[in-house]
């Protein structure tokens, strides 16, 4: 069952996201330090008549890595080719993509941490020397064919920084860590998107949605679309605070942006009576895979102080006990 606050992209969301995607720096809200630095690097590259160095974006899903790649291509006046690492299974897949690029093009690879080691080996000379080394044949008769490539910019995006190999990471000239958004930034995103959706969201309503959006624009826009549906059925011309609160309650998203999955996770930590809980134990208790827990549930809870990771496992913080109105003591239990 899909969560309304799922940070991964849901099916059929691509077209909706594209329609609400900012096209330039003036429309892009948040990530101010990254925007400033990229603005300098883009302007410098344009003045020199060169392409950009390769760029790597780290961070949880839904923070705008793909959007930034499109804005960079727009600002550089370059074409962009978008793909994901799981789509590049064989050397021929990568060769087909690289040989179809033109001078100055941008290649965006999402989930780049999922590239196999053999594909990475082919990518290294392409990134460094703009050359493709293809081995034809096998055994003593094998030959290496070198194909010159146009100068291009590779933009990689990953949610798993630790899974990027050191040799690949070192070939990116720019590395940026995407931060969660604050309520003010999300409120602006929601307000602008509501105008595009032709159902204006009042400021207090936008803030109410923003507070429950887990610091993530993708979640904020999804909640906005669903709240808009409630307002539409109620024959409301605008999204008012009462309608927003009612809709969010019906959607099962509480004041902290938590749903049942988050609360189940936190209850497990609280019930451990202060003892660290291993990731495998949590995943088994929740009937979820470890990757979902680590990539989807934990980042927001960690960033906002609801848990700590130790060498022995996960531990609930004082803030988590307060969430359940429990005293912060090692032997506390939910039941």
UniProtKB/Swiss-Prot annotation:
GO terms for molecular function: ATP binding; ATP hydrolysis activity; four-way junction DNA binding; four-way junction helicase activity. Its main location: cytoplasm. The keyword Ligase does not apply. InterPro entries: AAA+_ATPase (IPR003593), AAA_lid_4 (IPR041445), DNA_helicase_Holl-junc_RuvB (IPR004605), P-loop_NTPase (IPR027417), RuvB-like_N (IPR008824), RuvB_C (IPR008823), WH-like_DNA-bd_sf (IPR036388), WH_DNA-bd_sf (IPR036390). Residues 1-181 are annotated as: Large ATPase domain (RuvB-L). It catalyses: ATP + H2O = ADP + phosphate + H(+). Mg(2+) binds at residue 66. Its EC number is 3.6.4.-. Disulfide bonds: none annotated. GO terms for cellular component: cytoplasm; Holliday junction resolvase complex. The keyword DNA-binding applies. ATP binds at residues 20-21, 62, 65-67, 128-130, 171, 181, 218. Residues 182-252 are annotated as: Small ATPAse domain (RuvB-S). Belongs to the RuvB family. PANTHER family: HOLLIDAY JUNCTION BRANCH MIGRATION COMPLEX SUBUNIT RUVB (PTHR42848:SF1), PTHR42848. Homohexamer. Forms an RuvA(8)-RuvB(12)-Holliday junction (HJ) complex. HJ DNA is sandwiched between 2 RuvA tetramers; dsDNA enters through RuvA and exits via RuvB. An RuvB hexamer assembles on each DNA strand where it exits the tetramer. Each RuvB hexamer is contacted by two RuvA subunits (via domain III) on 2 adjacent RuvB subunits; this complex drives branch migration. In the full resolvosome a probable DNA-RuvA(4)-RuvB(12)-RuvC(2) complex forms which resolves the HJ. The RuvA-RuvB-RuvC complex processes Holliday junction (HJ) DNA during genetic recombination and DNA repair, while the RuvA-RuvB complex plays an important role in the rescue of blocked DNA replication forks via replication fork reversal (RFR). RuvA specifically binds to HJ cruciform DNA, conferring on it an open structure. The RuvB hexamer acts as an ATP-dependent pump, pulling dsDNA into and through the RuvAB complex. RuvB forms 2 homohexamers on either side of HJ DNA bound by 1 or 2 RuvA tetramers; 4 subunits per hexamer contact DNA at a time. This is Holliday junction branch migration complex subunit RuvB. It comes from Wolinella succinogenes (strain ATCC 29543 / DSM 1740 / CCUG 13145 / JCM 31913 / LMG 7466 / NCTC 11488 / FDC 602W) (Vibrio succinogenes).
């Amino acid at each position: 069952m899909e969560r309304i606050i799922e940070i991964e992209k849901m099916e059929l969301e691509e077209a909706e996201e594209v329609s609400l995607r900012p096209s330039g720096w003036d429309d892009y809200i948040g990530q101010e330090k990254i925007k400033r630095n990229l603005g300098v690097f883009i302007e410098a590259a344009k003045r020199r008549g060169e392409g950009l160095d390769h760029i790597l974006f780290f961070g949880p899903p839904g923070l705008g890595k793909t959007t930034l790649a499109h804005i960079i291509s727009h600002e550089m006046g370059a074409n962009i080719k978008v793909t994901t690492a799981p789509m590049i299974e064989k050397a021929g897949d990568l060769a087909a993509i690289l040989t179809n690029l033109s001078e100055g093009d941008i290649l965006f690879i999402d989930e780049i941490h999922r590239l196999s080691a053999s594909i990475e080996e082919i990518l290294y000379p392409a990134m460094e020397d703009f050359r493709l080394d293809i081995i034809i044949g096998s055994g003593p008769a094998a030959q290496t064919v070198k194909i010159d490539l146009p100068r291009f910019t590779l933009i990689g995006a990953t949610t798993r920084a630790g899974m990027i190999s050191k040799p690949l990471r070192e070939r990116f000239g720019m590395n940026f860590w995407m931060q969660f958004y604050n309520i003010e930034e999300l409120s602006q995103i929601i307000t602008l998107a509501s105008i595009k959706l032709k159902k204006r969201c009042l400021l207090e309503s936008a803030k109410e949605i923003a507070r429950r959006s887990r610091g993530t624009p993708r979640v904020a826009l999804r909640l906005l679309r669903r709240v808009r549906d409630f307002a539409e059925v109620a024959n409301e011309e605008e999204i008012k605070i009462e309608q927003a609160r009612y809709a969010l309650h019906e959607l099962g998203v509480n004041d902290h942006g938590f749903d049942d999955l988050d609360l189940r996770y936190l209850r497990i930590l609280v019930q451990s009576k202060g003892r660290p809980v291993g990731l495998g134990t949590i995943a088994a208790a929740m009937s979820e895979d470890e990757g979902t827990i680590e990539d989807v549930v934990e980042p927001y809870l960690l960033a906002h102080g609801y848990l700590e990771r130790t060498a022995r496992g996960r531990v609930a913080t004082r803030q988590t006990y307060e969430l359940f109105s429990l005293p912060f003591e090692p032997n506390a239990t939910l039941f």
